[in-house]
Amino acid sequence: MLGFNGFPKSISTSVNNVACHGLPDERPLEDGDMVSVDVTVYKNGFHGVCTATYVIGNAKDNPLVRYLRSVAEECLYKGEPHFNPSIIGIEI
């Protein structure tokens, strides 16, 4: 993301209620936090991104966390067949 529309970082971290592209800061992660990490690359005029979401501590036992993760996984599997090199992700 570094430089894309003025974004100041190559890695973004979205903690809890931050939807996406949060800026890393000094706040320590706490038990129960959900954090998504986006790592981006810019090469030959194209931006690529890889994202992973992690649950910190015992939140894996939290029903809301399990539900959010299952819905996100379902969306991934439903959208995945529609991706190809000619499609822009926002179109899906």
What feature does the model see in each segment?
Residues 1-92:
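Active-site neighborhoods and metal-handling regions in enzymes and metal-associated proteins
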